[in-house]
Curated annotation (Swiss-Prot):
InterPro entries: HD, Homeobox_CS, Homeodomain-like_sf, HTH_motif, OAR_dom, OTP_Homeobox. PANTHER family: HOMEOBOX PROTEIN ORTHOPEDIA. Keywords: Developmental protein, Differentiation, DNA-binding, Homeobox, Neurogenesis, Nucleus, Transcription, Transcription regulation. The keyword Transcription applies. CDD domains: homeodomain (cd00086). SMART domains: HOX (SM00389). Residues 90-102 have a biased composition (Low complexity). Gene3D superfamilies: Homeodomain-like. One of its GO terms (biological process) is neuroblast proliferation. This is Homeobox protein orthopedia. It comes from Homo sapiens (Human).
Amino acid sequence: MLSHADLLDARLGMKDAAELLGHREAVKCRLGVGGSDPGGHPGDLAPNSDPVEGATLLPGEDITTVGSTPASLAVSAKDPDKQPGPQGGPNPSQAGQQQGQQKQKRHRTRFTPAQLNELERSFAKTHYPDIFMREELALRIGLTESRVQVWFQNRRAKWKKRKKTTNVFRAPGTLLPTPGLPQFPSAAAAAAAAMGDSLCSFHANDTRWAAAAMPGVSQLPLPPALGRQQAMAQSLSQCSLAAGPPPNSMGLSNSLAGSNGAGLQSHLYQPAFPGMVPASLPGPSNVSGSPQLCSSPDSSDVWRGTSIASLRRKALEHTVSMSFT
């Protein structure tokens, strides 16, 4: 059977085999191992010799990995943390991980009802107690100052959340209109605008509209004050006819006519709606029919002589004139 040296001689030649054997002898001397057995061949290995002695170092290999098996090399490559430290203790990285796991464990504090009552009473006084108040409270209820501080932090967060929820449901802006929005027009203003538009939509020179409007205008009821004034004027005229005209009847009739005319004007030309402005009157003898709602110039001619004011005025003048005849 051929030895290891014979195989090297056959494969690599004498020169290469000598170089490899010399390199192996140098490694043995470096590791403090004696030379080869004098009775054996320089290339043979002893039965109980170190596997490093029989290994051949190639130029790219390290001495520490020569005697290692492939299985041990694979395990060391997969779990570098399991390798022992320089003094045989645990690896520093593994010890750091164990300390991190121990720090992550947190113990939940269970408060007794008496402790909770005392904490709530202090929270009602102030939401941000100082260090002295926390230490005093911790000594009183048998807790640490850090536990009391954490309880106050959690209690403040719960209080703020509850306050925000109640403010959302009780906010006045959710039920009332926004102040920036335009206000809705009143019913009177809307009716006045509708009446003005309906009156102005007809043409001012249309005689059919004036003729059709006369019966409806004549059938309008009188205001209560105007009816009382007319009845009083008729009763005064009848009394003057029965007793005869007194010396100052002319002044009385003139004052009565003037007062009745002023009353007519004051009652008839009060605006029906706040937004409508009455037209000015030129004098007591020339009374226009109604407020000037349209902006056309011929509307005054159409309304003149057809309104209830002019008819009542003529009736009153006729009654006063008949009282002197």
